[in-house]
């Protein structure tokens, strides 16, 4: 039996789509030196090559892909978006505005100088910034800009072409910029990170290991009684001195949980909870020959929970003010916008931050009620909320404003982005509403993006040969300028206007570019995870601004 593969793919859009995705994902795993091509560029290259052979796909699949992607971007940004906008993140907001705004203006200037149309200019901006949200926003706005027929098809093809030609140059140039810009500016990021660490009492280790606390029991002897010198537990400050706290005391056969007024007596058996290294550092008066093994005394259920910050009396306070250790709890991680932060007592808590806390189950539950709520450990997605807000986003996108002879539509990209932000924000405030497991959210977001990239490449592939010959050199030059010049402008603004610490500044700059590979290089250069503080500060707001930049460049382009 003979099978004509070309006819088979042309006759089955679903099969063609998944063939493109599979081949593209394989290609995306290849590396050029230390740089991995990535899924987006892999799928785009394969789809462009097949598009040259006149394979095509239903545009409805492309539209659904970009809608799912941009909605999930909003859901991710939602928990921290408003806190960055309205609280002490004004520096990060200003940095993101400078980065995105300068890139937009430079792209507009270069596009006009080279005589390109809006498709090439917007595509070049998206590729140079390695930002799919720009591509999505521009594509959606083009479809609602009044263009029709061949003019719209050409603009969309040029949009894909500009993105494909400049994406890799944007990624590689930013990675090299992240590696060498600190050296060219004579900035020692390691010293800057250590300075912040000293000021805030931070652990600068980017690869900090997290251990669970353990419980061990000891009998109080004369040395320990002499060490206590009649002071109660509050006066002794056991945790400050040892890193452990007393969870239980057995006295005269009676087991009890002590309060701060308890005084240690000869013969008491005490259960100490702390990290393994804290037990190892205990004074010999605790340990030598006095450890006991009592099932009832050691019977404590230590749990680790992720607590979402919600309560108004906690939001806006500093992490150190929670005094978790005074409540018998241990802080393992602080996560903001899916980014692990260094544990810093001076971090101002935002609504939606996640604190990973260990301790006795009752104590963790008590502290969770005071801070917010324990994140639901469920694999079930609230599909009703997902679909309802998706519908709301589409309806918002239908809104059109009329100004005399000029009309402006919000568009699906902005509408879905706003609806996603609201769903993410409400989820951070109501633990039982709109729950989407992080793995499910990432899968839908990535799948939507890959479907969109496949559709973009297949639709543009037939014209890539001609386009590459006509504007290839100009496009690569423009991509390099738009990728690096806004980074330099952002650095000068942050260093000399905002006077930010350099480690935080470089992290914030990579967050404004939403580029995780470059962020890893900055952390490696600083030998610290301190830059993650800056990265998290700009990342969420930059995703939103980049989508709006894609919409704005089409709106303000003459003739659209």
Swiss-Prot record:
Pfam families, per the entry: Asp-Al_Ex (PF06826), TrkA_C (PF02080)
Transmembrane segments: 8-28, 32-52, 66-86, 91-111, 158-178, 383-403, 406-426, 447-467, 475-495, 539-559
SUPFAM superfamilies: TrkA C-terminal domain-like
GO BP of this protein: potassium ion transport
Family annotation (InterPro entries): AAE_transporter, RCK_C, RCK_C_sf, Transp_YbjL_put, YidE_YbjL
GO cellular component terms, semicolon-separated: plasma membrane
Membrane topology: Multi-pass membrane protein
Molecular function per GO: monoatomic cation transmembrane transporter activity
NCBIfam families per the UniProt record, alphabetical: PRK04972.1, YidE_YbjL_dupl
Protein name: Putative transport protein ESA_02488
Organism phylogeny: Bacteria, Pseudomonadati, Pseudomonadota, Gammaproteobacteria, Enterobacterales
């Amino acid at each position: 039996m003979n099978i004509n593969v070309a006819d088979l793919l042309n006759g089955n859009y679903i099969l063609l789509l998944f063939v493109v995705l599979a081949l593209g994902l394989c290609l995306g795993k290849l590396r050029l030196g230390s740089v991995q091509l990535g899924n987006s560029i892999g799928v785009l290259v394969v789809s462009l090559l097949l598009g040259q052979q006149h394979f095509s796909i239903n545009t409805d699949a492309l539209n659904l892909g970009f809608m799912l992607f941009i909605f999930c971007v909003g859901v991710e940004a939602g928990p921290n978006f408003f806190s960055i906008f309205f609280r002490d993140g004004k520096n990060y907001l200003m940095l993101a505005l400078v980065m995105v705004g300068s890139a937009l203006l430079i792209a507009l200037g270069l596009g006009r100088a080279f005589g390109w149309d809006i498709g090439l200019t917007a595509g070049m901006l998206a590729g140079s910034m390695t930002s799919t949200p720009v591509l999505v926003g521009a594509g959606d706005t083009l479809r609602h800009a009044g263009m029709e027929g061949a003019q719209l098809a050409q603009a969309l093809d040029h949009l894909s072409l500009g993105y494909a030609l400049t994406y890799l140059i944007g990624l590689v140039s930013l990675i090299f910029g992240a590696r060498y810009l600190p050296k060219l500016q004579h900035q020692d990021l390691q010293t800057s990170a250590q300075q912040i660490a000293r000021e805030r009492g931070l652990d600068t280790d980017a690869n900090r290991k997290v251990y669970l606390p353990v419980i061990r029991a000891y009998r109080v002897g004369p040395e320990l009684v002499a060490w206590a010198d009649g002071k109660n537990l509050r006066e002794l400050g056991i945790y400050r001195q040892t890193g452990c706290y007393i969870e239980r005391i057995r006295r005269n056969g009676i087991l009890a949980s002590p309060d701060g007024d308890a005084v240690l007596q000869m013969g008491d058996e005490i259960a100490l909870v702390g990290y393994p290294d804290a037990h190892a550092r205990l004074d010999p008066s605790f340990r030598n020959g006095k450890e006991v093994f009592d099932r009832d005394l050691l019977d404590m259920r230590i749990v680790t929970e992720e607590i979402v910050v919600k309560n108004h009396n906690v939001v806006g306070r500093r992490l150190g003010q929670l005094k978790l250790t005074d409540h018998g709890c241990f802080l393992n991680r602080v996560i903001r916008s899916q980014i692990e932060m260094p544990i810093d007592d001076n971090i101002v808590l935002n609504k939606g931050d996640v604190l990973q806390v260990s301790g006795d189950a009752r104590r963790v539950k008590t502290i969770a009620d005071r801070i917010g709520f324990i994140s639901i450990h469920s694999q079930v997605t609230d599909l009703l909320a997902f679909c309802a807000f998706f519908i709301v986003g589409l309806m918002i996108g239908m809104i059109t404003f009329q100004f005399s002879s000029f009309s402006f539509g919000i568009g699906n990209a902005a509408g879905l982005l706003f609806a996603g932000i609201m769903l993410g924000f409400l989820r951070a405030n109501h633990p039982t509403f709109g729950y989407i497991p992080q793995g499910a959210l990432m899968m839908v977001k990535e799948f939507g993006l890959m479907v969109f990239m496949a559709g973009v490449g297949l639709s543009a592939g037939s014209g890539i040969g001609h386009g590459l010959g006509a504007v290839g050199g100009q496009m690569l030059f423009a991509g390099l300028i738009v990728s690096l010049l806004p980074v330099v402008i952002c650095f000068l603004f942050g260093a000399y206007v905002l006077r930010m610490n350099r480690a935080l500044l470089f992290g914030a700059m990579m967050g404004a570019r939403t580029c995780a590979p470059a962020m890893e290089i900055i952390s490696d250069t600083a030998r610290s995870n301190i830059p993650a503080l800056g990265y998290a500060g700009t990342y969420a707001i930059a995703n939103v601004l980049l989508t709006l930049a894609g919409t704005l460049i089409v709106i303000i382009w003459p003739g659209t």
